[in-house]
Amino acid sequence: MKLIVLMSIEEYADVLRKILINHRIPVFSETDVDGYKLSESEHLHASWFSGKQSGIYSHMFIAFVNEQKSDEVLSAIEVYNESHEQLNPLRGFQLDVERGV
C-alpha cells in the first residue's frame, strides 16, 4: 500500500481533483495549506519583528492506494507539468505504508 501526497497552489487544485477522479481514486482527503517559500538570501531571523509574511494558498491531497494507482496518478502529474508551463507546478510523492490498522 502507498500513501500519495499531492500539492498545488489554489488555482490548480481542480486539476488535481480531476486527476484523482479520472484515475478512479475512490477515497481521498484534501486540506488547505498556507505555503511559504523563502529565497536563499532570506533568513527567518532577518525579518523577525518586521511583521508576518503572507503565505500562498495551497491545497494538499492524500490518498491510500495500491502501487499501480500511485504510479498512474504520479505519471499523470508529470504529463500535466510537462505540457503546462507554470511557476508553481503540481507536486506529488509516494510513501510506503508498512502497516495499517
Positions of predicted regions on the chain:
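Positively charged, small/polar-rich N-terminal and surface patches that mediate targeting and assembly
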Residues: M1-V101
